[in-house]
């Protein structure tokens, strides 16, 4: 029985540098006695249970994998990361849905979907960050700061249980570290994307002109409005082949 709740990394206890690359590493989530809607046994660690996400950061040096496949030695002092993964996926697969049929061995998406904070939905989302790689990864949730509740399976609290959680614009997840962060979206400007909401206010997209096409984050809309079926014969410039 686990002695305390939190977010933990499990890994091989022998030849870690090699076996980590071979996939002998993972996440272990221990629930508190308060229930599934709490990160720790603290009332102020409450979150929305349907908005709990995990981001496990890992790395791949393809030369190590080739050496293992060919049963050849590998000098770990020459280690060089070639690929960075979130939940075992590289972009654009990292934003594919949970349980995507073409990713049978990587079932978890890295794309967090959250609802607007309001009276009917008062609690934030919880993102559990785990870094099983060799370098630090600074994270920033666009649009809002994240509140760091705990690190390495321990709540941020003082000797008398006082709340020591803090907000960060960018939080750095170090190698071998876990970090529990809450995130919320307050729809101050009423950019509501729910068609059933009384505040529904999509900005329509438009067909861009090829001569005015700019490579970069130009989506044809100030925000992603309503998804449409796309244009006949359209060659998309976005990863998912969608038109908004």
PLM features: residue spans?
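Copper-binding active sites and cupredoxin-like electron-transfer domains
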Residues: 1-244
């Amino acid at each position: 029985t686990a002695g305390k709740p939190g977010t933990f990394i499990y890994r091989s206890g022998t030849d870690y540098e090699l076996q980590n690359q071979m996939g002998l590493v993972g996440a272990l989530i221990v629930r508190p006695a308060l229930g599934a809607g709490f990160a720790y046994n603290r009332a102020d660690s409450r979150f929305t249970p349907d908005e709990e996400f995990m981001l496990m950061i890992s790395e791949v040096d393809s030369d190590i994998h080739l050496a293992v496949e060919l049963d050849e030695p590998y000098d770990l002092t020459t280690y060089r990361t070639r690929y960075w993964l979130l939940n075992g996926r590289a972009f654009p697969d990292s934003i594919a849905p949970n349980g995507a049929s073409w990713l049978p061995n990587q079932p978890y998406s890295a794309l967090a979907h959250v609802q607007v904070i309001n009276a009917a939905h008062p609690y934030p989302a919880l993102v559990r960050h785990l870094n099983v790689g060799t370098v630090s990864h600074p994270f920033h949730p666009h649009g809002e700061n994240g509140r760091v509740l705990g690190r390495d399976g321990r709540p941020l609290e003082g000797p008398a249980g006082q709340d020591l959680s803090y907000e960060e614009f960018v939080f750095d997840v170090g190698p071998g570290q876990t970090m529990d962060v809450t995130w919320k979206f307050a729809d101050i400007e009423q950019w509501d994307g729910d068609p059933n909401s009384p505040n529904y206010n999509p900005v329509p997209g438009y067909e861009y002109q090829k001569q005015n096409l700019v490579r970069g984050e130009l989506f044809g809309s100030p925000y992603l409005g309503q998804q449409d079926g796309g244009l006949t014969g359209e060659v998309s410039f976005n990863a998912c082949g969608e038109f908004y």
